Amino acid sequence: MKKVIAITGPTASGKTSLSIKIAKKFNLEIINCDSLQMYQKYDIGTAKITLEEAQGIKHHLLDFLAPGTNYSIYHFQKDARKKIEETPLPLFVGGSGLYLKSALFDYELTPKSLFLPPTSLPAIENMIDFIKQKDPQLIANLDLKNPRRILSAYQDLLEGTLRSQKNKKHNSLYSSLIFYLDIDRQILKKRVILRLEQMLKQGFIEEVNQIQTHFPNPNFNIIGYREIKALLEGKITLDQAKTLIIQKTMQYAKRQKTWFKNQIKPIILDALSPDLEKTTICLINDFLKTD
């Protein structure tokens, strides 16, 4: 069974830094598993790795889609599995849990959502609860005032769930070693605040302005981008935008941790441990020795 490694965790937990160290140590190529970092121009607000930070490590499925491109979990599953087969020892990096699970586990997805007649649809509130359970990142970035988007997200997830249950899926297709970088919430919040201030200094507001100016129908139902867009439209102040971004990010991080623990059951590592790199390397060495 092909071996695959993954490093996941909340924003600002140190995934990028650790992944580069591990990739250099074991001569790995990285497959991006952050659904937002796949899009071009969404750089500052997604904390996308820079060329300098990458240190020559090859990255796949990163910064390759034009804003507004329709690229679903179905497309990612196909592309990610192709990259897995092409890469001697792939390293997934990112916090989009459902994307990672769709690539590594035996999910059967199709390009079209299931058609459900209106009489069979649950209430909007129940759809939202279902989405929240299945994909915390999706609910964090979903416009809950838009019933059409809620229905679309619900149908996409329902299709994958029904097909998985019907075919008794959820079995791993690969021999996987998955790490989750855990971090104290108070320290994480301080990091999120610091990162947001850095993003604003780097030009986050201008980035949002440029995207909406030059691309039709860009996706701004994303934590950070949604609030900055509201700021540019004069609906909220900068302080209000910052407060909302921090609040939404922390809420998402909480749901994200619960989802990973329940759905993927990764090896949880202390992101602040001085022995983090050493521990990770030891675990990978042991993993590579097994058949």
Curated annotation (Swiss-Prot):
It is an enzyme of class 2 (transferase). Its cofactor is Mg(2+). Keywords: ATP-binding, Magnesium, Nucleotide-binding, Transferase, tRNA processing. The keyword Transmembrane does not apply. Residues 34-37 are annotated as: Interaction with substrate tRNA. Its EC number is 2.5.1.75. The record marks 96 as: Interaction with substrate tRNA. GO terms for molecular function: ATP binding; tRNA dimethylallyltransferase activity. It comes from the Bacteria. GO terms for biological process: tRNA modification. ATP binds at residues 9-16. It catalyses: adenosine(37) in tRNA + dimethylallyl diphosphate = N(6)-dimethylallyladenosine(37) in tRNA + diphosphate. Substrate binds at residues 11-16. Pfam families: IPPT (PF01715). Belongs to the IPP transferase family. Catalyzes the transfer of a dimethylallyl group onto the adenine at position 37 in tRNAs that read codons beginning with uridine, leading to the formation of N6-(dimethylallyl)adenosine (i(6)A). PANTHER family: TRNA DIMETHYLALLYLTRANSFERASE. Monomer. This is tRNA dimethylallyltransferase. The gene is miaA.
